[in-house]
Amino acid sequence: ELPIPEVPTEKNMHQIRAAEKLIRRKRREYEMQNRQFPEMEEDDRLKEYLDRCAFINKDGETCEFTTLQKHDLNLVLQKRHALLNWQQGSGKTAAVYHRAKYLLKFRKVRNVIILAPAIATNMTWIPFLSINREQFRVARKNADLETVPEGVFLVLSTSMLGKLKRGMARFVKRSSRKLCLVFDESDEITNPSSQRTRHILGLFRRLKYKILDTGTTTRNNIAELYSQFELLYNNSINMVCWSSRVYHENRDKEIEEDNNPHYGEPFPAFRGHVLFRACHCPGKSTVFGIEKQNQDVYNKEELAGLIGKTVITRKFRDFAGEKYKIR
């Protein structure tokens, strides 16, 4: 409960009302973010909005979303942070573009940052934004980030982050973090120790809205999901470790379990990936003394809860049906 003075003044009462309003809003956001995608229902107002949405494809044809695409996009628009795991060719680019357009239209953010590998920015995003007549700017030097008009898309390559780190940090601060991050091919940050991952987390983890999209959330093992969760949730209360047991290899090279000292707490910002691996995917050392990750998953119910409220997974066949054959 809020601390209330014995004889509150008019100023105290005004502060108390403002604090209670903030607490109610934060609680609503937390409850919405914590809802599992399979349990959510479509919002009628968002449904009407998405029925009017269209985009132009690379052949110059005006396209609309399918019913299933609109259903998934409706659920994503209700949350601040989400990961769209649609298979290649399912329309991820158009979906996350309209998610960003929605935030700009209703002035929830000032700008949209599109972060993608160099090949995706040049071959996908720049042609897509151009053919849809969208205002955008490609950031190649720090000067490009100094005078960015409100409502403009900012296209940024992951390989340029080291060069643009200082200018981007200033831009985020000037915008009061009222930005939307669209991270295309988010599996680029599967290694939590890489410099690229550290740059991306350091610059974008505190933004108001984030949408990640990729066709392959993990490449080898489940531990690679952690950096994407960390970018989305910033080690907040939405990212609580509910695994009561942790696992590690003993001297006899056998997996043994122990109590989790961080149970009920958010994953720590420092070495949180180590705790995530210990909870869900402990490594085993090979005969050469090198740690090797395997496909085993521990505490699967807790992991499924975290994935269920964050990731929407669809295959290309879900959208196209049996019309196409994948060879």
Question: Which residues does each PLM region occupy?
Answer:
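Conserved ATPase-coupling elements of RecA-like P-loop NTPase cores
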Residues: L164-K165, D187-I200, N221-I222
